[in-house]
Amino acid sequence: MPTNEEFYREYERLKDAGNLADAVAELEKALAQDPNYALAHSALAVAYGRLGKHDDAIKHGLKVCELEPNEPFSFTAMSVTFQRAGKILEAEDAMARARTLQAQR
């Protein structure tokens, strides 16, 4: 079975070739093997957002925040995901959390 890193490399190759749907499938395979693979969740949040699948993007973005609760970037990315989904209040809350975490460093 391929490693998480191998799935991710294939995702990047397919994404760079313009085949985002197949690229997403590679990350979903990685998550089937390791549901807590934060990098895959993060990439899926971006990819699903680009595909207009905002509910899926939010689901994966929230999982990243759950897996990395002390990482400001996770919440900054979540804010962008919420913005693209038209959820402005949630985006503002996520950005506030990112700023709080950054100030604690």
Language-model segments: residues:
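Alpha-helical segment of the N-proximal tetratricopeptide repeat
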Residues: 2-33
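Structural signature of tandem alpha-helical TPR/SEL1-like repeats
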Residues: 16-28, 51-63, 85-97
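Amphipathic alpha-helical segments of tetratricopeptide repeats
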Residues: 32, 66, 99-100
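Short, charged, intrinsically disordered terminal tails
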Residues: 93, 103-105
